[in-house]
Amino acid sequence: MFVNRWLFSTNHKDIGTLYMIFGAWAGMVGTGLSILIRAELGQPGSLLGDDQIYNVVVTAHAFVMIFFMVMPIMIGGFGNWLVPLMIGAPDMAFPRMNNMSFWLLPPSFLLLLASSMVEAGAGTGWTVYPPLAGNLAHAGASVDLTIFSLHLAGVSSILGAINFITTIINMKPPAITQYQTPLFVWSVMITAVLLLLSLPVLAAGITMLLTDRNLNTTFFDPAGGGDPILYQHLFWFFGHPEVYILILPGFGMISHIVTYYSGKKEPFGYMGMVWAMMSIGFLGFIVWAHHMFTVGMDVDTRAYFTSATMIIAIPTGVKVFSWLATLHGGNIKWSPAMLWALGFIFLFTIGGLTGIVLSNSSLDIVLHDTYYVVAHFHYVLSMGAVFAIMGGFVHWFPLFTGYTLNETWAKIHFTIMFVGVNMTFFPQHFLGLAGMPRRYSDYPDAYTTWNTISSMGSFISLTAVILMIFMIWEALASKRLVKSVPLTSTNLEWIYGCPPPFHTFEEPVFIKST
C-alpha cells in the first residue's frame, strides 16, 4: 500500500508532495554548502584546505539549489499541486510520466553527490567551462558524473514541461479559454515552454564536453579546430532562460498572494501580466551573451546585447507596478504570506536594478566575476525565488495539509530571514565594487570587514531555516484545522476543501460558459 501510493504514484497531489519533500531536503543540503562557503570566507586565511575543495562546494551549492531545490519545489511541487486544481482538471495529462519526472531526480542528485566523492570533485563552477572542465584540468570521473547528473535532471524537466503544456492546453473545461486561467497557471506554462526550448541546447553542450573528455573529439579544443567560446554560447543559451525559469513561477505565486491578501478579486492588469511574462520568456532567449561580455566580442555585438538586456526591464517593470497597483486601495491583511510577497517585490526590484547596472557591457567588463555579480543574482534568487517559495508555502500550507501554521512564528521567521539574507548579500555589492573576485577561497585583508558581516548574515539565515523546520513540525503536531477560506469564488484551488480529496472529482467537471 505504502509502496503503491508513494513509489508508483499517479496522483498529482502525492507527486507534488514528493517534490516538496525532496526540494526541502535538497534545500537543507544546499544551505549547508552555503554555510561552508561563508564559514571559509568569514575571515582571511584557509579553513577547508585548498581552492579545489572550495570550488567543489561552490559548484555543488549552485547545482543543488537550482536543480534540486528551486525547480522541484516551484514547478514540481506548487505546479503539480495547484495547476490541475486551478483549471479544474482531474489530474495531469500524463500521470505516470509525471511520476517518472520525479523519480529521475533522486538518482540525478545521487550522481551529483557521487561526483564530489570521487577523485578531487568537480571544481568547475556551475557553468562547467572547458578547458577547466576538460580531461587535463579535471582528470577523473568527477565532471563526467556531474554531466550525467545534469542529463537526468534535464530529462526530468523536459518531461515535466511536456506534461504541463499538454495539461494546461488540453485539460481545461471547454468553456474556459486560456485567458481565463489564473496567472500561476500561465507562469507555469510559459516556464515549461522555456524549459522545452532551452534544455536540449544544454544537453548538446554537455554531451559535446563529455565526448571531448572521453572520446578525443575537439568541439571545444582549439588544437583540433574547436572553440571553447562555442561551449559558452551553448551553455548560456540555456543558462539565461534558466534564470527566468527559476523566477517565473514565483511571479505567478506572488500575483496570487498579493491579490488574495489585498482583498481583491483579480490582479491589476491581468492581460498586461500575461503579456509581460510572455515577453520576458521571449526576450530571455535573445540576451544570453551578456554573460560573455569579457570574451572579446565586437563592439556592435556588445551594443545589441546591452540594449536587448535593458529591454527586459520593461515587462519586469510592468509586473512590479501591477503588483503595487493591486495593493492600492485594497483591504490589506498583513499575513505572513503577504510579508513574503512584499519582501519579494522590494528585494527583487533591488536585484533588478543591479542587473540593469551589469547589462552595460562597459561596466560589466569591470564588474564581471566580482562579488557584485554574486550580490545581483542572489538578490533575485535568494530573495526573489526563495521569498516566493516561502510566501507560496505559508499561503498554501493549509490547502496542502489541512492544518494552519502558527502565524506569530511565521512572522518572526520572515523577520529573521529578511535580516539574514540582506546582511549576507548587501555587503557583497561593496566587495564587488572594490574588486573582490568570485570563486576564491581567500582574499586580501582589505576585504575582511564586509566578508565577516556577510558571513554573520548567513548564520542568521540558517537560524531562520531551522525555525521553519520547527514551525512545520509544530503545525503538523498541533493539528489546528482550517475553519474557513475567504474569496474561494476567485481562488478555485480552495473550493475542493482543505486538503482536497485524493481524487478531486468523482465525475467530469461542467462549467457553464458565460
From Swiss-Prot:
Binding residues annotated for Na(+), in chain numbering: 40, 45, 441
UniProt enzyme class: translocase
Coiled-coil boundaries: none
Residues binding O2: 244
Cofactor entry: heme; Cu cation
Chain residues that bind heme a3: 376
Family, as annotated: Belongs to the heme-copper respiratory oxidase family.
GO annotation, cellular component aspect: mitochondrial inner membrane; respiratory chain complex IV
UniProt-listed Gene3D superfamilies: Cytochrome c oxidase-like, subunit I domain
The encoding gene: MT-CO1
Name of the featured protein: Cytochrome c oxidase subunit 1
Associated pathway: Energy metabolism; oxidative phosphorylation
Compartments in which it is found: Mitochondrion inner membrane
Biological role stated in the UniProt entry: Component of the cytochrome c oxidase, the last enzyme in the mitochondrial electron transport chain which drives oxidative phosphorylation. The respiratory chain contains 3 multisubunit complexes succinate dehydrogenase (complex II, CII), ubiquinol-cytochrome c oxidoreductase (cytochrome b-c1 complex, complex III, CIII) and cytochrome c oxidase (complex IV, CIV), that cooperate to transfer electrons derived from NADH and succinate to molecular oxygen, creating an electrochemical gradient over the inner membrane that drives transmembrane transport and the ATP synthase.
Record: residues binding Cu cation: 240, 290-291
Reaction catalysed by this enzyme: 4 Fe(II)-[cytochrome c] + O2 + 8 H(+)(in) = 4 Fe(III)-[cytochrome c] + 2 H2O + 4 H(+)(out)
GO molecular function, one term: metal ion binding
GO annotation (BP), single: electron transport coupled proton transport
